[in-house]
Amino acid sequence: MPNGRSHFLPESDPGESAKATRGAGVVRARASTPSKGDTRARIIEAAREAFSTMGFEGASLRSVAKEAGVQHQLATYYFKTKEELWMAVMDELAIGFFARLGERIRGLEGVDAPTKLRLVVREFVKYSAEYPQLHRLMTMEGRRESERLAWLIKRHVSRFYSISTKLIREAQATGVVRPGDPGQLHYCAIGIATSAFSLAPEYKLVTGNDPFARSHIEQIADLVCDFLFARPEKDHQRRNK
């Protein structure tokens, strides 16, 4: 990061040099002050942890501001209410996922449905490992009906459900994916994909394994695919008669 000081100050009178030094100090001070984007990002990052560990009721704007290292008044400048901050957190997590998902799907144009489903599953598992807070937050909000849950469903959840079940139905049509209600398969697959990450402290203490190890993430993705692509034995036998 530039420190604002010129490497070659002119050899002028002491007064001019002093002015230049004071000016450089001002520039350095400004350079060390976080930009608006950085400040907002720090607040959202702190809020993401707070909401995903303490829940909406347990977190507060004041505690989030303290964790982010900013004044409470500055936090309220960016987010007038706790609800507004919570929505910003959910938007950032969901929009980030949809951006990754969209890029992946666009890159799979012309690919067969089963392969597309497998690769999208792996993208979802990878994102869930990078941002375990997403499923923790979804689990907290999904426990009871509320305005926040209704907002989430309308704004993000329904969209993902539609994409996911469409991919499942298309892959089922080829005969290589487990038969059954796509909605049930969707939610069961999410459970397999996210549990080790969202319950990471418990999982690590019980199993002794690091859920965020690259090899483990790959294994989880394999498990989700094995679940979706496995067919009941009777169905398999019937199809091969």
Residue map of PLM features:
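Amphipathic alpha-helical segments used for helix-helix packing
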Residues: 129-150, 200-207
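Short acidic/histidine-centered micro-motifs embedded in hydrophobic/aromatic stretches
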Residues: 137-141, 155, 188, 192
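Amphipathic, non-transmembrane alpha-helical scaffold segments
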Residues: 44, 90, 94, 117, ...
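Short coil/turn segments at alpha/beta junctions that flank glycine-rich nucleotide-binding fingerprints
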Residues: 53-57, 131, 174
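Hydrophobic alpha-helical connector segments
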Residues: 103-134, 182-189, 233-234
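C-terminal peripheral helix-coil segments that are non-catalytic and often amphipathic
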Residues: 1-27, 119-126, 130, 158-174, ...
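Helix-turn-helix
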Residues: 42, 50-84, 88
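Generic hydrophobic, amphipathic alpha-helix propensity
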Residues: 39-48, 64, 89-97, 101, ...
